[in-house]
Amino acid sequence: MSGSFDRYVSFKNCDWKVRSERVMARLQRHIDAAENPFWAYFAQKRTELREKQGLDDLRVLHNYLPTLRELLEDNGDLETLAMLEELEVNLM
């Protein structure tokens, strides 16, 4: 099999990339606030996973879904939590 494989072919017309970027943009607020050591770790792992393994934001979010969900609930960030859960239900 030659060429690249698009593992998101079933997500055609779902805007998964834009939706993932929106969630990451909202998570950036938590990363910048640095109120929990996890956020620095998450930012570092995101960079590593993207650069070294070629993973996109949807996959990075999926890798940390339970922790992200818990922290967003604890912080009362229900809007970002809803966006994350929508990604989970529709695209993960």
Swiss-Prot record:
Keyword rRNA-binding: no
Domain of life: Bacteria
Disulfide bonds: none
GO biological process: nitrogen fixation
UniProt-listed InterPro entries: CowN
Keywords of this entry: Nitrogen fixation
Family, as annotated: Belongs to the CowN family.
Entry function: Is required to sustain N(2)-dependent growth in the presence of low levels of carbon monoxide (CO). Probably acts by protecting the N(2) fixation ability of the nitrogenase complex, which is inactivated in the presence of CO.
Stored HAMAP family: CowN (MF_02117)
Full protein name: N(2)-fixation sustaining protein CowN
Source organism of the structure: Rhodopseudomonas palustris (strain BisB5)
